[in-house]
Amino acid sequence: MMTHEALIEIVGLVRLFGATRVLDGVSLTVGSGEAVALLGPNGSGKSTLLKIVATLLRPTRGTARVLGHDCVREAEAVRAGLGLIAHGAHVYDDLTALENLRFWTTLSGLPADRERLTAALGDVALERHAGIRVRTFSVGMKRRLALARLSLARPRVLLLDEPFAGLDQRGRKWLQGRLETFKASGGAVLMATHSFGRELEIADRLAILAGGRVALDTPRAALGADDVQRLYVAHTEEAAL
């Protein structure tokens, strides 16, 4: 059995919001060259888990480590090796596409020369829109602009929240190819989703989050589409009882 260097290590994570226990002892590992699809209904804690790993939220208890760095005590080191694409485009409507990337790279301490930024726009077929204000873009174009950051940052770990939501066909095809290449280079991918689409085609493992816990963690290759849906329904309904 192939083993992978652990790039994401989550152990016993608990997160309370008031009296509500959103995460209840979650443990999960994502290795080098692996993509894990974190599948669960709305409100199951998927986004909360990603925010903790991304250093945007502190756990109540438990630990999360990225590239060996603790997500609370070594947040800056974690962010240096991590790429995050949250749900929604998160771009600036009053800036052009090129200005959006220049602003983001400057904040991230990355090179911001025009040739490099234009090449990143070309990766997502937006180079002809470089000088156009983003307020005129479609939802899919805005999502592709957000994804262009992946061509600039070169992280070792990717966190994706509903990665294919809002993408047009060109964007979906580009992202799927980009993620396959990223895995082949030894990167680790953790994707949160409630759909049964392309995320599951890319995933090496499937983790079902229900009732604040990992109800199932299993290799994806052994499961057909009907198996995934059956297991998802069974575990989420059980957690709701």
What are these regions (language model features)?
Residues L39-P41:
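The feature captures the beta-strand-to-loop junction immediately N-terminal to the Walker
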Residues A54:
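Helix-to-loop junction immediately C-terminal to a conserved catalytic motif
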Residues R102, T106-H129:
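Conserved ABC ATPase "signature" region
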Residues L158-D161:
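Catalytic Walker B motif of ABC-type/P-loop ATPase nucleotide-binding domains
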Residues T193-H194:
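H-loop/switch region of ABC-family ATPase nucleotide-binding domains
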